[in-house]
């Protein structure tokens, strides 16, 4: 009995020692990852200021913060309502902080932190952990510096989804179901959060996330056993429940007739401006006359200032978008379009110089995974499945996604780079998981042990070579990548001087209301954490994606204007601002066709040091 108790005591102590070692290693991982993120964050903060990349994020921020309508509003149109409402709630509590930008910054660095911590769990020695952190930090710096400095919500959503896939795939399969679910709570939350931030981006990369899920499930010893089905069924169910609940709340929040009407207009606007070409008036005069639009009104589509004309509603927008799409189909048959898209895909994959380093990074990862799988096959037979179907499966899915966006005719960097990032992160997870799967194999004979030792040595060499190649690729790109960010940052600093003068002018004339020509302002962007002013802005755009929304109507009401056209033609405190390089003839012609006798009169100029940037026009007599 005494011997039994001693044995039990020793086993308990061994378990406690193992737990303490595990906790110590986790602490080391978190400290190293935290220092990595701190260094990257400090570098960016010292060298640059964080910017909103596009006007989309600026307007979304304005709506959420309250600077658009006067009160923080969760209906920011682009994001799903739950996360948008949450951010607006924080703004209601503290208005002076840039919560919107802070949220995205935390998302970015939080994803990097989670990936670094999980990666370091694959090694035990501190110097190996530091090496992994340094390599990942270099890759982040070299390939994602632009996305860190210039914040864009589409990229954030993709990074959240990719991180979730990474965490799911690198979860130890030897865990019990409860432990497995517990370890993947963060993965589930990240996917749901990505869906709320930018549902279209999450849906675009969701096939690659599904590939990860299928590959992970396939690693189970008994794939269709009850426990395996239950393990992954709960994960799938939780994801679907979160997505459905998020979408349900969003639909209820946008369920009013005004929002439904605007959403119809918004969808048609997206189709027209993002994927089609606005039909010219002279060649399509019969069509425009059939829907009641003259030439001066068609010009409003071209210069994006259609908000001035109340007759351009969701029905008119839908007809123009449908007509533009139909004309595009006539110009290029579907079969021909498919061939051109396929040709473009192979061009991007092999010949596009602008994406060559991203493609090199992806190819390196594919080759490394394949070689490691072949080597480890000597120890664990099913590891060859990486070569037989996992890598081809991932490549086929990524090819379909690329073909889709190419066929749609719109491949901005925020989408293409997000696809690259997602693919690379998944391949990195496969690289790490191969080492764990090899260690999982029980050694049953001396011969197998020798094979295992020899193969492990070969695999370590492959890992080292892969790391060296990745570091070399990153170092090769780092100088040019940094220079690119420097140039873009300096360009924005110079261009934004005009925008700052415009904002200062409007702020100095709070008793007046200004409507801005849309394309006079698209070149400008705002800093995330500098010059934060969340008070009501006394200017609005003549068009844009939020135009004619309930938020836009609230904005006009807050400014004391019933409609743009009525305001600029009848209210003496309402003005139009246009860049000095842009003509104002379109407004003169529009007013004439509408029966107004007034003409735009330049009454002020905005600029500094003798340089005129914007002209201020008065129409009302």
Can you say where each PLM-predicted feature lies in the sequence?
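Start-transfer (signal-anchor) and selected internal transmembrane alpha helices
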Residues: 1-43, 217, 227-239
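Extracytoplasmic loop-helix module adjacent to an early transmembrane segment
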Residues: 37-77, 87-92
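Short hydrophobic/aromatic helix or loop-helix immediately within or flanking a transmembrane segment
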Residues: 73-107
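Transmembrane-helix motifs of polytopic, lipid-linked glycan transferases
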Residues: 106-126, 370-378
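Signature aromatic-anchored transmembrane alpha helix within multi-pass, membrane-resident enzymes
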Residues: 130, 184, 230-241, 425, ...
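Membrane-interface alpha helices of multi-pass inner-membrane proteins
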Residues: 182-199, 210, 235-245
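Membrane-proximal stem/loop segments at transmembrane-domain junctions that anchor or position
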Residues: 254-343, 534-551
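Short periplasmic/luminal acceptor-recognition loop of GT-C membrane glycosyltransferases, typified by
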Residues: 475, 499-583
């Amino acid at each position: 009995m005494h011997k039994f108790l001693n044995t039990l005591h020793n086993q308990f102590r061994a378990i406690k020692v193992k737990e303490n070692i595990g906790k110590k290693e986790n602490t080391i991982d978190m400290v190293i990852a935290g220092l990595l993120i701190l260094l990257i964050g400090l570098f960016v903060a010292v060298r640059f200021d964080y910017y909103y990349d596009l006007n989309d994020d600026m307007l979304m921020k304005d709506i959420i913060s309250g600077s658009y309508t006067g009160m923080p509003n969760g209906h920011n149109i682009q994001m799903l309502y739950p996360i948008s409402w949450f951010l607006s709630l924080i703004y209601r509590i503290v208005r002076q902080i840039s919560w919107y930008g802070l949220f995205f910054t935390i998302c970015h660095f939080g994803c990097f932190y989670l990936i670094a911590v999980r990666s370091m769990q694959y090694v035990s020695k501190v110097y190996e952990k530091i090496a992994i952190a340094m390599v990942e930090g270099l890759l982040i710096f070299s390939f994602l510096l632009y996305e860190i400095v210039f914040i864009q919500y589409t990229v954030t959503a993709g990074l959240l989804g990719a991180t979730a896939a990474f965490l799911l795939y690198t979860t130890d399969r030897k865990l019990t179901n409860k432990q497995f679910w517990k370890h993947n709570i963060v993965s589930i939350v990240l996917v749901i959060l990505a869906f709320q931030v930018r549902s279209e981006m999450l849906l675009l990369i969701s096939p690659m996330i599904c590939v990860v899920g299928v590959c992970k499930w396939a690693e189970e010893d008994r794939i269709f056993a009850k426990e395996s089905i239950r393990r992954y069924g709960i994960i799938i169910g939780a994801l679907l429940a979160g997505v459905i609940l998020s979408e349900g709340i969003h639909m209820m929040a946008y369920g009013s007739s005004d929002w439904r009407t605007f959403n119809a207009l918004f969808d048609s606007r997206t189709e027209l401006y993002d994927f089609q070409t606005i039909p010219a008036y002279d060649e399509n005069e019969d069509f425009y006359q059939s829907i009641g639009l003259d030439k001066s009104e068609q010009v409003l589509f071209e210069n994006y200032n259609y908000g001035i004309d109340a007759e351009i509603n969701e029905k008119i927008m839908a007809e123009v978008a449908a007509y533009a799409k139909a004309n595009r189909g006539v110009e290029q048959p579907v079969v021909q379009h498919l061939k051109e898209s396929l040709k473009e895909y192979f061009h991007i994959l092999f010949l596009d110089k602008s994406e060559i380093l991203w493609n090199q990074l992806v190819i390196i990862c594919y080759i490394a995974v394949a070689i490691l799988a072949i080597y480890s096959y000597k120890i664990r037979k099913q590891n060859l499945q990486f070569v037989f179907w996992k890598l081809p499966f991932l490549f086929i899915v990524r090819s379909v996604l690329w073909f889709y966006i190419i066929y749609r005719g719109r491949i901005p960097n925020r989408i293409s780079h997000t696809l690259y990032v997602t693919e690379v992160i998944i391949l990195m997870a496969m690289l790490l998981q191969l080492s764990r799967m090899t260690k999982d194999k029980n050694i049953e004979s001396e011969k197998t042990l020798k094979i295992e030792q020899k193969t492990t040595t070969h695999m370590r060499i492959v890992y080292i070579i892969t790391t060296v190649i990745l570091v070399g690729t990153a170092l090769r790109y780092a100088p040019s990548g940094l220079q690119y960010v420097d140039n873009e940052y300096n360009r924005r600093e110079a261009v934004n001087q005009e925008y700052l003068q415009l904002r200062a002018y409007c702020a100095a004339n709070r008793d007046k209301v200004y409507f801005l020509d849309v394309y006079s302002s698209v070149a400008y962007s705002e800093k995330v954490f500098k010059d934060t002013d969340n008070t009501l802005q006394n200017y609005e755009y003549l068009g844009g994606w939020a135009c004619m929304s309930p938020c836009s109507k609230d904005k006009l009401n807050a400014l004391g204007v019933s409609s743009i056209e009525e305001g600029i033609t009848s209210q003496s405190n309402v003005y139009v601002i246009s860049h000095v390089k842009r003509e104002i003839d379109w407004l003169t012609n529009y007013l004439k066709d509408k029966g107004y006798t007034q003409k735009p009169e330049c009454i002020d100029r905005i600029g500094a040091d003798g340089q005129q940037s914007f002209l201020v026009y008065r129409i009302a007599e």
